[in-house]
Every structure is written in C-alpha cells, then in structure tokens.
Amino acid sequence: MAELDLIAPGPLTGVTAHPLAPLGPDPVSAIPVEKEDADPLSKSGEETQEQGHDPAELGAPGEEDQILCDFCLGASRVRAVKSCLTCMVNYCEEHLRPHQENSKLHSHQLTEPAKDQDLRTCPAHHSPLVSFCHTHQQCICQECGEGEHRGDSTVSLDAARRNKEVDLRCMQLDLEQKLKLNENAIARLQANHKSVLVSVSEVKVVAEEKFGELLAAVRKAQADVMVFLEEKEQAALNQVNSIKTHLEHRSLEMEKSKQELERLAAISNTVLFLEEYCKLKKTEDTASPSIYIGLKDKLSGIRKVITDSTLNLIQLLESYKEKLQEFSREEEYDIRTQVSAIVQRKYRTSKPEPRTRDEFLQYACDITFDPDTAHRYLRLQEDNRKVTNTTPWEHPYPDLPSRFLHWRQVLSQQSLYLHRYYFEVELSGGGTYVGLTCKGIDRKGEERNSCISGNSFSWSIHWNGKEFTAWHSDTETPLKVSPFRRLGIYVNFPGGILSFYGVEYDAMTLIHKFDCKFSEPVYAAFWLSKKENAIRIVDLGEEPEKPAGSSVEAAP
C-alpha cells in the first residue's frame, strides 16, 4: 500500500523580531493593530529641538500609536517610558523620577508603556491586574489572589505570557504540519483521478478485444459489460471527488485557524493576549489521510474473468453481467477506490463507546445547514442553524447543481470523515427525517433513491408525530421508544457506527443504532416532508430541559 509521505515542516522563514510573529507576509490576514496617519500639521524637527526635546521623544499629534506622558501638558507632551499599574498613569523619564527616588513609591508596579485602554483593572476590586490564575484561566489582582483565588496556582503576567507563547507556537507548528500533509493528500487525490481513468480504460480495451471475437451474438453482452465498468468508474471518481472536497474544506478551516493564531500572536498587550488566548478553541487533531488506489490490482480479477470466460461465452451470454456483478460484490474483485487513513499511534487505541452526555461531548462538532443544498421550500434562519418547511412559499435561492429540486431536503455544510462526531438537533412537527448521506445523492430526481430514506448510502430515522422509525435502502424499521424532542447523533466513522439518542436532562436513551460501511466522507442530512416542520441544530452548550410529559408534538 502506498502511503502518504509525512512531511515535517521546515524552518519557518520571516520570523525575526518576535517568536510568535506571522510566518510570512500575508496581505489578507496581516491586519494592523493601529492605523498610522501622518499629520501634515506636525512640527518640523527644528521647532521640536527648540523646545528642548529630542524629536524621537516627542509624540507627533497624528501618530496614534505613540504613548505619551500623562503629566506633560500642551503640545510638548513627551513619549512615555513606563506605565504604573498602581497609579494607572503613563510617565515620561522626567515625571518617572519620583517613582525611582521616593521609597514610598517603590512598591508600585511599573511596566512598559501601555495605552489607557490597556491599563486593565479588576472589575470586582478596581485594582491592577498583576497575576494570572492557572486554575481559573484568568488575570487577577492582588486582592483576588488573597481572596477567592487563595490557594490557586498563579504566576506573574509576564511568566504566564511566556508559557502561553510557547504553547501557541507549538500550535502554529502543528497546524503548519497538518496543513502540508492535507495539501499533499489533495495532490495525491488529483493524481489518483487520472489513475482511475487509465485503469478502467485498460480493462475496457481487454473487453473490446474479447467481445470482438464473439461477433453479433456478443454485442448485447458487450454493452452490458461496458455499462458495468462505466458505472464502477463513475463510482470511483465520485469517491475521489468527495474525499477531495472534504480535504479542501479541511484546508480552508485550517487556514482560518492559522490566521487566527497569527492574529493572536500579534497582540502586544499582555492582558488582552491572555484573555484572547483563553477564549481560543483548541484545533481538533486531524488524522492525515494517505491515499491508496488498489483499483488496478482488483481490475486484474475482472480481466481474468473476461479472458477465461471467452471459451464458454456462448453458454454464459445470458448471465454474463450477473456473473460480473457477483465478482463485484466480493471484496477480492471490488471495483472501488480504497482510501486508507494513516493515523498516529496515539490515536489508534480503541476507545470505549461513550455512554453519558459528557462523554459524547468529547466528540462535539459544530455543523450548519448548507444553503447551497436547501430546497426552495426550506427557510434557513439563525445563522443556518434552523430550517423550516414553508410550503407553498418558495425562497429565491439561486439554481445550483447541488440544490435539491424535488425532495424538501438539506445537507450539512461540513463533511464527517475519519473521526468520531457528535451533534444534537431539536425537532418540531411530525414528518421530520434526520440522518447521514453521501455527497453523490441525486439532487434533482423524483425517485425514492433521491431521498435520504430510499437508498443504500443513506441512514435516517423518522419522527411522524407519534413514534420513531428507522430507514435504510427504502426499508422501514419500527422503533419502540419514547418520544423525544431533542436528538443526539453520534457518528463513529472508523467503527462504522451511526447512533441516535434521545437527550434528556439526566439521561441518554438509545433510539436506534446503524452498522454502516463508510467508504467516503458523509454529510448530516435532513428531510422536512410536511409544511411547518422545523429542525434546529442545538448549541451543545445548552443544557437539556427537564422531562415533562411528551417531548415532541406533531405539527398542526
């Protein structure tokens, strides 16, 4: 099996002044903290020197980024050299002398000059913030440290920043490496696209030669085999394109995360930096997929079948395509694009399946409805986190190939691949379906296989206002469970598990579990079959309501 080359990121260029500076010039993401405008009314160097100060010490009136002494008056305000966190004042060298010479002021904490808005005080005690509490991940004043934070693990602000800068740098380097691996995988997928075409083409040539020997009696069987191969070719290409789309989406997410880390690294104010860092969401560890196409090896089996069967083809003409289908169903001759993921050893351990909501939340994922797939009768609200069936009122969505034309369905914008995932939805009204499907689901067809209950690559449960049923391959399975308004959906992609849970205040009740065979990225899928149906993607920070009677009511 060909494996993806793990490329360690090389030395990062362009980092000279600050260890957390951006990795290179980026006109889009490199947003200046302050905008400097030259003031045409600023005084000349000669006029400045006549006032007895060096031009470098004076703050030009139009230079907003310069921090001036608060004790200096008029136009001769001098640049500050220190800020006192006790006095909450900026001092120039001259006005700083009392702090240096008066022993009563030696206890005041002096820092590098800071803008007025950066001289942060404790909102509870109105005292300067002097320490960082590791226990509660926040900046605190001295009174906080002696009170509610007594006994907590605390360090100075400067020490806390140094520690966080090291962590931030590691995150940047780790993200750089993952981004390179992801881009490498995308490049391999592009190459594999050609490999699929070439490999299938080779089998077509063999089939053409052998069927030529059978003359007119073989023409119908020849056409059947060609259709068979083309279907498998299209299926393989669809898988490649689906995986490529997933990886490209991951690249975009990691680019956004990279820009956010660079923005955070550029913050000069220590307190603001620490506050922003504590809000920072850790980047999810992502397995680095390695792409292997075993198509040619598997097609050799088909080639052997075609060659060997030529001698007995007259007797096999009626069942030729059926015989090929039998080989296709066997793993040995399965004409598919096989994608293997190379996962770091620390992620290969088999973790037990979660049981409590807190355990499920370890795999929380933030999904939204994809407006480019929503049927025109579906209205998206709340930043694409709520969908409502507004039949017969249409919405002026653009006509796109990805939009569902007949079935009132919508997919998630995010694909699920290689990992475990958990999200929750809230149902309103009977006739709602929730599940998973693949990217290749037909968007324009009216047949049952175009909806998420009627094909072999979709799995869903249906709430009809009274009870739940499970659907797969157009087969319905009644479920004997209590009604629930909020559902938890758990996906274990490597394990081939899709589970639906009823979410209550103090319990997680299994509604149904599908054993699936995932071979490409999947998408959360939703079908609102009746008007005024609604589905809302729940913010996982919302605690479930305490149970009170029936949880779900049918729509009027």
UniProtKB/Swiss-Prot annotation:
Reactions accelerated catalytically: S-ubiquitinyl-[E2 ubiquitin-conjugating enzyme]-L-cysteine + [acceptor protein]-L-lysine = [E2 ubiquitin-conjugating enzyme]-L-cysteine + N(6)-ubiquitinyl-[acceptor protein]-L-lysine
Residue ranges of coiled coil: 163-266, 312-332
Ranges of residues in domain B30.2/SPRY: 347-545
Enzyme kind, highest EC tier: transferase
Region annotation Disordered: where it falls in the sequence: 1-60
Cellular component annotations (GO), alphabetically ordered: cytoplasm
Major location category of this protein: cytoplasm
Modified residues (Phosphoserine): S107, S195
PTM entry text: Phosphorylated by ULK1. Auto-ubiquitinates via its B-Boxes.
Entry keyword Cytoplasm: yes
SUPFAM superfamilies: B-box zinc-binding domain, Concanavalin A-like lectins/glucanases
EC number, UniProt record: 2.3.2.27
Keywords of this entry: Coiled coil, Cytoplasm, Metal-binding, Phosphoprotein, Repeat, Transferase, Ubl conjugation, Ubl conjugation pathway, Zinc, Zinc-finger
InterPro entries according to UniProt: B30.2/SPRY, B30.2/SPRY_sf, Butyrophylin_SPRY, ConA-like_dom_sf, E3_ubiq-ligase_TRIM/RNF, PRY, SPRY_dom, Znf_B-box
Subcellular location: Cytoplasm
Tissue specificity remark: Widely expressed. Expressed in basal keratinocytes.
Biased composition (Basic and acidic residues): 33-56
Database matches in PROSITE patterns: B302_SPRY
SUBUNIT field: Homodimerizes via its coiled-coil domain. Heterodimerizes with MID1, TRIM24 and PML. Interacts with Galectin-3/LGALS3 in a ULK1-dependent manner; this interaction mediates autophagy of damage endomembranes. Interacts with BECN1. Interacts with ATG16L1. Interacts with p62/SQSTM and LC3B/MAP1LC3B.
General function of this protein: E3 ubiquitin ligase that plays an essential role in the organization of autophagic response and ubiquitination upon lysosomal and phagosomal damages. Plays a role in the stress-induced biogenesis and degradation of protein aggresomes by regulating the p62-KEAP1-NRF2 signaling and particularly by modulating the ubiquitination levels and thus stability of NRF2. Acts as a scaffold protein and facilitates autophagic degradation of protein aggregates by interacting with p62/SQSTM, ATG16L1 and LC3B/MAP1LC3B.
PANTHER family in UniProt: B-BOX DOMAIN CONTAINING, TRIPARTITE MOTIF-CONTAINING PROTEIN 16-RELATED
Name recorded for this polypeptide: Tripartite motif-containing protein 16
Name of the encoding gene: Trim16
